[in-house]
Amino acid sequence: MGLRLTPGVRVRLATLAVACLLAVGAQAQTHPLPDPLPSWNDGAARKAIVDFVSTTTTPGSPQFVPPAERIATFDQDGTLWVEKPIYSQVVYCLDRVPDLVKAKPELAKVEPFKTVMSGDRQAIARLSMQDLEKILAATLTGMSVEAFKAEAAKWLDMARDPRWRRPYTELTYLPMLEVLKYLRANQFKTYIVTGGGQDFVRVYAERVYGVPPEQVVGTAGATKFGYGKDGKPFLTKEPRLLLNDDNAGKPEGIHLMIGRRPVAAFGNSTGDRQMLEYTKAGSGLRLSMIVLHDDAVREYAYGPAQGLPDSKVGTFTQALYDEAKKNAWTVISMKTDWKRIFAWEP
C-alpha cells in the first residue's frame, strides 16, 4: 500500500524542495567556474582570446565554427618557450659536437667544429648562420630516427639553461600553456608550427604542451628506409631538407601537413608573419596574436619594435608591429598582459 500524504504535508514538502533548489542555485552563483586564464591580466589581449572562443563556439552565433574546423597553430620558440640567448636546439647541436668529433677525429681541425671544440664562447657566438647550418646538418643526421629521439630526450633531461639553471622544458610560458588548454577544452585542435626541427620538438611536445607528435609541423629533413642487421626495418635521418618551416614555409607546411587554414594563430617574430597573415585572410572571425618580448626583468626585452633592443634571435621589427596594428592582430605585451611568465615563479 502506498504512503498517503495529507495536503498540508504535501505543501511543506513542495516548499522544502523549492528552498533546496534555491539554495543550490545560490551556491552555484557563489562558486563560479574557474578562470581558464589565471596568469593573464585583464586587458585587450585576454579579452580577445575569451571573446574569440566564446563567439566561435556558441551555437547560433553568426561566427560559429564547427569543431572540425577549429584549428589553432602556435609557433614555439619565443611564443611557447624561451628562445634567448640562443635556440635550445642549437645548444643541443653544439653540445653534440664533441661526440661527433670523437667519432670523426678529422673534424677537430675543420671549421666550424674546431671553434666549437675550443670552448671559446665569444668565438662560438660569432659563428655565422652558414656555420650553424653545417653543425646542425652534421649533428642531426646520419643516425636512426629512434636513436635521435633517445639522444635528444637524454639531453633534455640533463641540459640546463644558463640563466635560470632549469631544464629547457621548464622555460615554457604559463599563460600560453593556459591558452592551449583553454582552446582544447573548447574543441580546438592545437598544432605547433615551428621553424625548429620537427623531430626534435616531437620528442617532448606531448609531455610539455599536450600536443601529440602528429600535430607538430616543423623544419623537416629527409629519412631513408632500410633494414638493420637483425632484419628489422628502420629510418635513417639524412642531410636533405624537405621543408623549411619558417616565413612563407609556415603556411606551406600548414597546407601540406594539416590541410586546413587555421582560425587562430600565435607567433612572436618576423618568421611568423606569413602564418599570421594566412590565418587572418580566411573567411569568418579569425584570431592572429603576436607576443612582444618587452620584459627584461622577468624574461628578455628585444624587438627592435617599439624601441626595444635589436635581436638576431626572434626579430620583431617595427614594420611587423605596424602591420599587426593595421590588420587587427592582437599584440601581447609580456610585461603588461602576463601576471606570471613561468609556472615556477612565486
List where the protein language model places each region.
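Short catalytic/ligand-binding loop motif for oxyanion handling, primarily in non-cytosolic enzymes
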Residues: 82, 89-90, 200-201
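Non-catalytic pre-domain segments flanking phosphatase-related domains
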Residues: 13, 20, 27-76, 91, ...
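C-terminal cap/substrate-recognition subdomain and adjoining C-terminal extension
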Residues: 29-40, 44-50, 54, 69, ...
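Asp-based phosphoryl-transfer active-site loop
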Residues: 70-85, 276
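Short, solvent-exposed loop/turn elements at domain surfaces
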Residues: 58-60, 81-83, 225-226
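A metal-dependent, Asp-based hydrolase signature
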Residues: 86, 91-170, 174
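Bacterial N-terminal signal peptides that target proteins for export
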Residues: 2-14
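Short regulatory "switch" loops immediately downstream of catalytic or recognition motifs
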Residues: 1-2, 55-58, 279
